[in-house]
Design a protein with these regions (language model features):
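Bateman (tandem CBS) regulatory domains
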Residues: 1-4, 10-11, 16, 59-70, ...
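A glycine-centered beta-loop-beta connector
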Residues: 19-23, 27-46, 64, 85-88, ...
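Conserved N-terminal catalytic core of the sugar/cofactor nucleotidyltransferase
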Residues: 52, 150-223, 228, 233, ...
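A short, polar/charged loop-to-alpha-helix boundary motif
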Residues: 46-62, 111-123, 280
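The conserved cystathionine-beta-synthase
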Residues: 5-26, 32, 51, 72-93, ...
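N-terminal nucleotide-binding beta1-loop-alpha1 segment
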Residues: 110-139, 144-145, 152
Length: 353
């Protein structure tokens, strides 16, 4: 962090030297006054524009400092931080300073690696036997099968890390020791915690084993998905709708190869020639209010559709979020080959857009 800080009395030449020593594309300095308080930021572009206006290399940095700078504040709420990061991305800012209560630098967020900070707990469901993928899953749990040289679940952990989700649980049962071994060290900076099912608990029941806070929201997703879902947009949709649950959905279009009659009793009122209809399929990714998840019976088998239908019947607001982008449910040999072909030349889902 210190390599990005420069005193406002330092010269422009000092600033250029410091910027040249920075690696990667985060060519931004944070300018501090004699008391260590942050007064602004300075980029190589700011310096170039200043030199063109006649600023000299021996002039102080404070002459060119950008004082109306964007920053994260440690006292800000989670949603305020999220909105600041969105505005910074839209403005093309890569490095975002984090300022403490005294106005000093508390940290730096590189938006090229962490695009958001979602206030979510995440639970990845990884206890299934993957029987349709045998013999591949005889000795390897499906989430650890490799696609593009990486475990399937690793792509999902990477997506969580890019969105600043750090509180991550993985439910395990089949070949649980292998899953625990995989998560015995941090993955993408996340130290996930494994929760083992004593008996199969369905597609949602294992979430009842996680000690969730009474307030807040939790992302629940199948661990055998390959998807470029925008988790930030899904979260914002969930919050803006005031939903108790949001289901990620995949558009699924069905074509009928015949002319279809519209009828009223025995009377034909219309004819549609080979119509198509688009439906939305459950993508196996959800955001729940923790208050709703508190209704899960502890340690009992519960499937997500049944739980959601019960919530709808009780009058809870359940919405859907359509996925625009890649989504592959790796549940069959055909889908495994499809995903493998897709990732043959990509090491990261971010390359898919």
């Amino acid at each position: 962090m210190q390599k990005h800080i420069i005193p406002e009395e330092a010269t422009i030449l000092d600033a250029l030297d410091k910027i040249n020593r920075l690696s990667g594309g985060a060519m931004t300095l944070v300018v501090a006054d004699p008391e260590g308080k942050i007064t602004g930021t300075l980029t190589d572009g700011d310096i170039r524009r200043g030199l063109l206006r006649g600023t000299g290399l021996a002039d102080p940095v404070k002459d060119l400092v950008h004082r109306r700078f964007m920053a994260l504040h440690v006292s800000a709420s989670a949603d305020e931080r999220l909105q600041t990061m969105r505005r910074a991305r839209e403005a093309g800012i890569r490095l975002l300073p984090e300022i403490d209560a005294d106005g000093r630098l508390a940290g730096l967020v590189d938006l090229s690696t962490v695009r958001s900070q979602l206030p979510l707990t995440a639970v990845l469901m990884a206890g299934g036997r993957g029987e349709r993928l045998r013999p591949l899953t005889l000795n390897t749990p499906k989430p650890l099968l490799e696609i593009g040289g990486r475990a399937i679940i690793d792509y999902n952990i990477e997506n969580l890390a890019r969105n600043g989700v750090k509180d991550v649980y993985v439910t395990v049962k089949y070949l649980a020791d292998m899953m625990r071994g995989y998560f015995s060290r941090p993955r993408h900076g996340i130290m996930a915690r494994c929760i083992e099912e004593e008996s199969p608990l369905g597609t949602l029941g294992a979430v009842s084993l996680v000690n969730l806070p009474p307030q807040g929201h939790t992302l629940v997703m199948n661990s055998d998905l390959l998807t470029t879902i925008d988790l930030e947009e899904m979260y914002l949709h969930h919050i803006s709708e005031g939903a108790q649950a949001t289901i990620a959905a995949i558009p699924y279009t069905m074509s009928v190869p015949y002319a279809i009659l519209t009828t009223d009793g025995p009377r034909v009122t219309g004819i549609a020639e080979k119509p198509t209809a688009t439906h939305f399929a459950n993508a196996g990714i959800y955001i729940f209010a923790n208050s709703l998840l508190s209704r899960l019976p502890h340690g009992e088998r519960t499937d997500a559709p049944d739980f959601l239908l019960d919530a709808i019947g009780r009058g809870d607001k359940v919405t859907y979020y359509p996925i625009n982008g890649t989504w592959i449910d790796i549940g069959s040999p055909e889908e495994f080959r499809h995903a493998s072909d897709l990732m043959q030349h990509h090491r990261s889902l971010t390359k898919l857009g």
